[in-house]
Amino acid sequence: MIVVKKAIAALGIGAVAVSVSSINASALEKGTVTASALNIRSGPSSDCDKVAKLYKGKTVEILEKSNGWYKVRVSSSVVGWGSAKYISTSGSSEGTSNQNNPTSSGTTISGNGKVNVSSRLNVRSGAGTNYSLVGKANNGDVVKLLEQSNGWYKIKLSNGVTGWASSQYISKTSEDVGTNNSSNSNSTNNSDKKPSSEESIEGKNGKVTSAVSLNVRSGPGTSYSIIGKLNGGDVVELKSKNNGWYKVKLSSGTIGWVSASYISETNEGTKEKPNSSSNQNSQSNSNSKPSFTGNSDKSTAKGSTIVDFAYTLIGIPYQWGASGPDKFDCSGFTQYVFKHSVGVSIPRVSREQANFGSAISMGNYAPGDLVYFDTDGDGTTNHVGIYVGNSKFIHCSGTQTNPNKVKVDNLTSSYWSKVLLGARRFV
């Protein structure tokens, strides 16, 4: 028989821990989103419809708990369910001021964990993103596990630093602490210096699978400087591999490092980049606009930030006049992305956005540029999106009578190539 004892705080009576499918949470309990973007759904299941999207650091009121899901209040009018794995509750922060002692809300654990991230993992003073950074761990580092609390591990690094890190990026391992650890080593920007764990893989090629431009860096990690870019479909020569990064040789002869997450080994040969001079025709005469047939991407760091953020919104439904975060129209989507990704404020309506910033000639589009269209055939702008590279753009598609959603389309398609008017750059 399952017995649930109600905790009566006024009498100080403790509750016996029991397993129940669903319990009510205190209306005062708060949670903080720990994922970069978290879908909020109509019910406690990933099969339920999305009703909103929340971003890292957002604080919500927790109304109910059920089988690994939290029912949360997003706004005065929106309530939905989010995975508890990506919501850190306020209760998990109690007692974390002294990092050498177990927290009152954490469960003591033992063993070691291995860091699994594409870049570096933040280590914080408490179990939540609202706590200050006390260190960083690199991909492949092995750390000592001390406690577990609401999707966070309390860990001890090889240099003695103790703090909290998201358990999403740590897997339990039998390896010893300090294995592959580089948290305390001096970083280098010299890509010719071979890391100790580098594995030679001469004679193989790799193909870029990223939907957006892929950064090429001077070393195996995001802390290294960007020395080039690759587009989806590019084939490069693989030289070696180190902790989730490939050392590659580009067709231009440049040697650098790229994340292995976006490279698949291939039998295809490397190619010289096609001369893009055929695409350099300016749109000085809007009445004789050529169809879009391709582009030479010249990405920037801010452009990549814009595109990466826009991709987190894919699938959000169209609603005429909406500007987010749970519904958009086309210009509401672009305005929201520029504001929340790089802090740039642009006009609200599409025709004004098409006159904002700097005009970019066809063939010179870069990821993060605004692209604008005339879908009515009257010569004026009535639709906008954001160029993501590789001749593709992301936009909130739909009309007032035929709503759609945020998605990616190809500018070289028979339809979009004919209605494209141009591009503008805001950063």
From Swiss-Prot:
SUPFAM superfamilies tied to this protein: Cysteine proteinases, SH3-domain
Deleted gene: phenotype: The deletion mutant exhibits significantly delayed cell autolysis and increased cell viability compared to the wild-type strain. Deletion of the gene impairs toxin A (TcdA) and toxin B (TcdB) release due to the decreased cell autolysis in the stationary/late phase of cell growth. Mutation also significantly decreases sporulation, increases spores germination and increases cell length. In vivo, the defect of Cwl0971 decreases fitness over the parent strain in a mouse infection model.
CDD domains, A to Z: SH3
Biased composition (Low complexity): 179-190, 275-291
Keyword Repeat: yes
Family: Belongs to the peptidase C40 family.
Name of the protein: Peptidoglycan hydrolase Cwl0971
Species the sequence originates in: Clostridioides difficile (strain R20291)
Lineage, top ranks: Bacteria, Bacillati, Bacillota, Clostridia, Peptostreptococcales
